[in-house]
């Protein structure tokens, strides 16, 4: 007789073998079962998403103009991690996938305090990510899908005379995840938290060109519910990571005043331009180095049998190079459209890499 498929228990697959003594034995395979890297990658996927969402909010849009504004943004992109030794060596499992979200953001208060411009507001977002995960040997482990809903708030301070600014963000996200392999469908829910402090100081190179050194610190945490699949229990420890981004923004600094409309159409005569070339436009590029450190997050698997528990702690530590570029145009007196695209490349460790594109509608009132 024979097993139709390997028997799974805890972190291992077992096969039925018959020895020379004619007795039958269950033996574990040399590698972990596919669900080990699959479930471990759930920690990384949620934290990658949370960081990308928080990073998609630009302080530039929140401080432009004197009026409160509402911004609607749509972003999509690719995210993943290279093979850096696999789960057996404590690295984040190799993965590749996509994400997308819609974010609505609005200013609540804009005022002047002690020579500083202060803006506060809130935002909400809904998104989805789907990532294919590979086993240590390069074979397919499965797919993790995540539906996420987020709420956040921000405080922006700008020193009126020097232009020095600071941007503080706090964000919470509810994650609903499903990890699917050939043998299991595992579901988990959890919460992600994030706090960010970003600062920059603009310098005018020419009348229309600006250089702005930037520095950002981000802390994030994650808590996923424990669960069980066909082979035993799955438990998650509290996850956390810290990130430092250092870079600069180089871009045009043109007057974005819309001026008088020039359209020949009567309904749009006072509010629209005759041609696209008349629209006020600014562009920017932003290269950065991002360092991830002090990452933590355990995933344990086992059964009721004593000694079966195995704990895995995939590291997200590493360094990546990031390049973002964007363009914004004022299409009405109170409406600005923006587009941006970016690419991140891991140069060491288990840092995330990928690319993204975003479109933003900004309306002042």
Residue ranges and their predicted role:
Residues 27-214, 219, 225-227, 340-363:
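Outer membrane beta-barrel translocator domains of Type V secretion systems
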Residues 225-237:
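Acidic, Ser/Thr-rich low-complexity linear motifs
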């Amino acid at each position: 007789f024979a097993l139709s498929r390997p028997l799974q228990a805890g972190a291992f697959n077992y096969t039925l073998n018959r020895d020379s003594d004619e007795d039958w034995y269950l033996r574990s395979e040399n590698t972990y079962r596919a669900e080990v890297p699959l479930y471990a990658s759930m920690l990384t996927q949620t934290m990658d998403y949370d960081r990308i969402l928080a990073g998609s909010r630009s302080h530039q849009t929140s401080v432009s103009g004197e009026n409160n504004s509402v911004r609607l943004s749509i972003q999509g992109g690719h995210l993943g991690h290279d093979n850096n030794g696999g789960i057996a060596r404590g690295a984040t499992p190799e993965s590749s996938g996509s994400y997308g979200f819609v974010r609505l953001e609005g200013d609540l208060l804009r005022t002047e305090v002690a020579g500083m411009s202060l803006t506060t507001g809130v935002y909400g977002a809904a998104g989805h990510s789907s990532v294919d995960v590979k086993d240590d040997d390069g074979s397919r482990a499965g797919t993790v899908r995540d539906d996420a809903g987020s709420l956040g708030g921000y405080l922006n301070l700008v020193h009126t005379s020097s232009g020095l600014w600071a941007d503080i963000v706090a964000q919470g996200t509810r994650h609903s995840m499903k990890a699917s392999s050939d043998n299991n469908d595992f579901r988990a829910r959890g919460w992600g938290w994030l706090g960010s402090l970003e600062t920059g100081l603009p310098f005018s190179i020419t009348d229309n060109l600006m250089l702005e050194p930037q520095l950002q610190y981000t802390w994030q945490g994650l808590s996923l519910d424990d669960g069980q699949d066909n082979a035993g229990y799955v438990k998650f420890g509290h996850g956390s990571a810290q990130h430092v981004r250092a870079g600069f923004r180089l871009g045009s600094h043109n007057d974005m005043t819309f001026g008088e409309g020039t359209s020949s159409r009567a309904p749009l005569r006072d509010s629209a331009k005759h041609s696209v070339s008349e629209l006020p436009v600014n562009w920017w590029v932003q290269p950065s180095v991002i360092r991830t450190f002090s990452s933590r997050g355990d995933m344990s698997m086992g059964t009721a049998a004593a000694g079966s528990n195995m704990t895995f702690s995939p590291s997200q530590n590493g360094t990546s190079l990031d390049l973002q570029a964007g363009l914004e145009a004022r299409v009405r007196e109170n409406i600005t459209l923006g587009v941006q695209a970016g690419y991140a490349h891991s140069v060491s460790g288990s840092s995330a890499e990928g690319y993204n594109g975003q479109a933003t509608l900004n309306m002042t009132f």
